C-alpha cells in the first residue's frame, strides 16, 4: 500500500490500531466465538484454494490453539521445532503427536556466526544493518544513525528509524558515520535471524513440501513487529506469497490461560500453576512467555529474577554454558550472554541470590511482565 505522505500513513496505522484495541476489549466469551469463526473461515478458504493447513506449535498459546481447533472437529497436523523448547513443553508436544522439524543451524552456531538476539527483533535488525554496510543500505544506515530518511521515507526527520539514543551510543559505532560521531561498538555480533534458522525456515520448508499454510498462536498484545503485522493484516491473511491464520490476534495472555483451563489443556510445568487475580485476570505462577534458552529479546524490560536467573534455578549447568562459554572471540577466549548483558547494563551475576527465599518465586505474576501500556514484553520472534 502506497501513501502520499507521512501523515496519511500515520492516520492509517492509528485506524488499524484502534480497530485492534476495539476487538481486544470485547468479553472473553465473545473472543472465543470470534476465534472459532476465524478458524472455520480459514479452513474453508484453504479448501477453496486447494491448500492444506497445519498448526505451528511452540509454547502455551499455540498449544491452546491446536486444542481448540481439534475441539471444533478439525484434524489438522501439528508441526513444531520442538527441540528449541523447554523439556516440559517437549513432553506436551509428544503427547499432542507433533511433527518435529529440525533447525537449520544449532543455537551455538547461530550465536557465533550470526549474532546474539538481544533487545528486540526490530532493534537487532537495525544493529545488524549497521554492522553489514553496503551501498544498497546506505540510506537506511544513515536513517538508523540520524533519524533522517530519504525519498522513500518522504524525507522525514527524527523518524522511528533511528535507534534509541541509549543503544545508539552502544552500537552506533558499527557504522562509519556513527563511529565518526563517537558512538561505541561491541565486541560481539547482534542478529535478528535466530528464529529464521531455528524454526521459521524449517517450518516453511515443511509447509511448502506439504502444500500447507499455518495457524499461528500470535497476539497483538505481545507488541513489536507482531502487533504491527496483526493490526495491518488481521487474523486471516492470504497474500501473494504468504497465507496464515492467527485466531488469537486480539487476545491477551489472560484470555489464553483462561481458555487453556476451559479446554482442560495439559499446561507444561514451566508455566507453573494457574491463578486468578482479584480483577479476574488468569495468569500462571511460572514463566509467562517461553522460547529458546538463548533468547534475549525483551530482557531489558524484565525485573530480577529475569529469564536468565530463572534458567539458573532450572539448570545451573545450562546457565553457566550460555552465560560464560557458548561462544569464542577471535583469540579463542570463551564468552557468552554475560558479556552481552554487561555491555547493555543488565545485571546477571549471583542468580542464586534470587532463589534463597522461595517467597520471591511465589510473588511473581503476569504483572511483572507487562509494559506500561499493559501489553506483554516482546521476547520472541516466534
For the regions a language model picked out, list residue spans one by one.
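ATP-dependent adenylation/nucleotidyltransferase module used to activate substrates
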Residues: 2-256, 260, 380-382
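ATP/NTP-dependent adenylation/nucleotidyl-transfer catalytic domains that generate, transfer
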Residues: 2-21, 51, 241, 253-382
Amino acid at each position: 500500500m502506497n501513501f502520499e505522505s507521512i501523515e496519511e500513513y500515520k492516520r492509517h496505522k492509528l485506524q488499524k490500531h484502534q480497530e485492534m484495541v476495539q476487538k481486544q476489549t470485547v468479553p472473553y466469551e465473545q473472543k472465543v466465538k470470534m476465534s472459532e469463526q476465524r478458524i472455520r473461515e480459514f479452513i474453508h478458504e484453504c479448501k477453496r484454494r486447494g491448500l492444506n493447513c497445519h498448526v505451528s506449535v511452540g509454547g502455551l498459546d499455540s498449544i491452546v490453539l491446536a486444542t481448540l481447533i481439534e475441539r471444533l472437529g478439525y484434524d489438522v497436523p501439528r508441526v513444531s521445532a520442538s527441540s528449541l523448547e523447554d523439556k516440559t513443553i517437549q513432553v506436551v508436544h509428544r503427547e499432542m503427536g507433533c511433527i518435529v522439524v529440525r533447525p537449520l543451524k544449532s543455537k551455538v552456531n547461530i550465536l557465533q556466526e550470526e549474532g546474539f538476539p538481544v533487545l528486540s527483533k526490530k532493534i537487532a535488525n537495525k544493529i545488524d544493518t549497521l554492522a553489514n554496510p553496503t551501498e544498497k543500505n546506505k540510506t537506511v544506515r544513515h536513517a538508523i544513525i540520524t533519524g533522517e530518511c530519504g525519498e522513500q521515507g518522504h524525507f522525514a526527520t527524527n523518524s522511528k528509524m533511528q535507534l534509541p539514543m541509549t543503544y545508539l551510543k552502544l552500537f552506533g559505532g558499527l557504522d562509519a558515520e556513527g563511529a565518526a560521531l563517537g558512538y561505541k561498538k561491541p565486541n560481539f555480533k547482534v542478529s535478528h535471524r535466530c528464529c529464521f534458522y531455528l524454526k521459521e525456515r524449517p517450518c516453511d520448508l515443511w509447509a511448502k513440501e506439504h502444500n500447507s499454510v499455518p495457524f499461528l498462536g500470535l497476539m497483538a498484545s505481545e507488541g513489536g513487529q507482531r502487533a504491527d503485522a496483526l493490526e495491518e493484516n488481521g487474523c486471516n491473511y492470504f497474500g501473494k506469497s504468504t497465507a496464515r491464520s492467527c485466531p488469537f490476534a486480539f487476545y491477551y495472555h489472560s484470555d489464553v490461560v483462561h481458555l487453556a483451563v476451559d479446554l482442560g489443556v495439559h499446561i507444561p510445568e514451566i508455566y507453573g500453576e494457574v491463578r486468578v487475580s482479584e480483577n479476574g485476570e488468569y495468569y500462571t505462577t511460572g514463566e509467562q512467555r517461553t522460547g529458546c534458552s538463548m533468547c534475549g529479546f525483551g530482557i531489558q524490560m524484565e525485573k530480577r529474577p529475569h529469564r536468565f536467573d530463572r534458567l539458573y534455578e532450572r539448570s545451573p549447568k545450562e546457565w553457566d554454558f550460555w552465560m560464560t562459554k557458548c561462544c569464542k572471540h577471535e583469540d579463542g577466549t570463551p564468552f557468552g550472554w554475560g558479556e552481552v548483558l554487561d555491555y547493555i547494563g543488565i545485571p546477571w551475576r549471583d542468580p542464586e541470590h534470587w532463589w534463597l527465599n522461595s517467597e520471591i518465586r511465589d510473588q511473581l505474576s503476569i504483572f511483572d511482565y507487562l509494559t506500561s501500556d499493559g501489553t506483554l514484553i516482546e521476547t520472541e520472534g516466534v
